[in-house]
Structures are given as structure tokens and as C-alpha cells.
Amino acid sequence: MTKPYGSSLDDHLDAEVAREPSLADTAATIRALAAAAIDVSETVGRGSLAGDLAAQGEHNSDGDVQKALDVIAHKRFMQALEEAPVAQVASEEAEDVVTLKAGAPLAVAIDPLDGSSNIGVGMVVGTIFGIRPVTPGEDPNASFLTPGTTQTAAGFVVYGPATTFVVTLGNGTRIFTLDRTDNVFRLTHDAMKIVPSASEYAINASNVRHWDGPVKSYIEDCLRGSEGPRDRDFNMRWTAALVADAQRVLIRGGVFLYPGDNRKGYAQGRLRLLYETAPIAFLIEQAGGGATDGQGRILERVAAKIHERSPLVFGSTEEVECVGKYYDGRQPSAGRSPLFGQRGLMRS
């Protein structure tokens, strides 16, 4: 149902719980995350006045060097989740699953600070999260080693010129913008619908020499524009923050690619399944888009470990399907042979 623009995130969550009472705990958890996001937004907005947010510290679970803002965001979201009905948290900034409230019904996977390379230069950063039901048993990891289809909600926050909170509880994807006059997230984009086709793609083109043939062929054909097999010109965008590219795709369509490649450690791409690709896939699908890993639907993947990586292609359905055709040989580029045997964005 269409909601009035300017209605609050709290109003939306109340309506979702009225529609489906079983979402009450999920809604409470989203409220906690939104409150923490407002605090993080304040810190980001102060920039260097808040200290050296780009100062480097220890390495996180994935080998990335933690920056000061990574640690600040992690601590603030963990504090918020301690007050929510959450039993376990899988965070990019923690090696192991963190246990909060034994017996609580939910588990949260979170990237507290997406786009860390943008810290300190005034560019967009964000937060990504996915909420799942707890899997009973003694293994705290078990709740996360389930398909992305088990998520009860997913969302991301963009800390940019405006702070936006993008969320789905399985009933469409909506964007709420932080109203600085009263620190309330208010609806600005209701029931998002990604256009099925758009002439814009996002990829880190500096890695072209490492890409597999299908990715190279797809991008080459886009670059050939109206004179090539795609019969139209394309624009390229890349922000180094997944949340910013995802929000752009939600609003005006296009496709995002982060494939696996032949660099050491990048065979499965760089993004993490639990707290990056699965939440984004849920949001994109709820807005009518597509999200794959090159072999199949992201939401059907089951992680074998907490920090498992996954290739990612998402966006307008026609363009996501087009990328897939380059892998299964249905879309050989002009002057090239079909790419037999290339069945996925994941390298063996």
C-alpha cells in the first residue's frame, strides 16, 4: 500500500507489524539499528572535526586494515543491538560471531562501515545489515549458515550529502531520509521499482587485466556503445561504496558488478555473502530487480563460513540476465567465439 511521503520509519515499522505480527522483534531490531545510524551519521558529518577517522589500526577478520571510523561504527551498532531482541551478531569487524542475549529470537549480520577507503576524503560510506531468525542449537554460527531467503529484513544506510535508511521487511523496498530538524527518518521513496533496463553499469575498471573473458566481453561490448552489439551507449559509475551504487540502481536502474577474478584471494570476489551480498540481494529483489553470483540467485546461496565471499551482479533484470548470457555462451560478442565452459562469475 502506498504510504504518504514524509511518514516516519517508526510509522512504517508499526504498519509492517500490524500486517504481520511475527515481525515485531524484527521491527524492534531495525529501530535499534536506525538509532545507531543517526549517531554514526553525526560522526561522519563532522568529518575531521571528529578526529582522524581514517587513522589505521589493526586488521579485521578479512585482513583489511581497520580505520578509526570502522571501530567507532562497530562499537555503536553493537551497543544498539545489545538492547534489541538479538542473540547473535556476525560483523565484518569481528573474527567470530558475538553472542548477545541467549534465547533471543534473531541474528544480525552487519558491515558497520561500508566503503572504508572513502573515509577521510569526504566521499560516501555506509552500513549494511541482514536480519535472520536464530537457528536453535549450541553452534552460534548456525543461524548464519542458512540461505539468504531466511532473512526477515535487510537494509543499508548511506552517509552522504543526505543520510538515507533503505529497508525491506519482505514487503517492498523503501528509502527513508534523515530529517535533521528532528533526527527522524522520513519516507522519501515508497515501494521502489527498478526499471527493467538502463544504460549504466558500475564496476571497478582498474581490475580489467584480472577479469575472466565473460566480464571483459560484457564491458567491451558496453564500451562499444551504439556501434557495437548492444546498440546503445552506456555510462560507467563507481563510488567504492556498495551502498551508494545500490541506492543509485534502486532509483534509476542499471547494473553493478563485482566479479571474481584471477588475483590471489579474489577468486570468489571481494564482497562478503552474509553482510553484503545477501542483504543487498534481498533489497534489490524486493524492488523488482535481479541479483546473482553468476551461477545462480544470491539469496539461494548458503554460506559455509561467516566471512565467506561471493561475486555479485545486481540491478535491472534485463541487464543482469544479459551478463549471465556472456557466461553460458548465449551472448558471444561480435568477432569472438562463444565462451564455452564459463559458467559463472566464480572461478574454480
Curated annotation (Swiss-Prot):
Its EC number is 3.1.3.11. Binds 2 magnesium ions per subunit. Its cofactor is Mg(2+). One of its GO terms (cellular component) is cytosol. Mg(2+) 2 binds at D111, D114, E276. PROSITE patterns: FBPASE. Keywords: Carbohydrate metabolism, Cytoplasm, Hydrolase, Magnesium, Metal-binding. Signal peptide: none annotated. It comes from the Bacteria. It is found in: Cytoplasm. Homotetramer. Belongs to the FBPase class 1 family. This is Fructose-1,6-bisphosphatase class 1. The lineage of its organism: Bacteria, Pseudomonadati, Pseudomonadota, Alphaproteobacteria, Hyphomicrobiales.
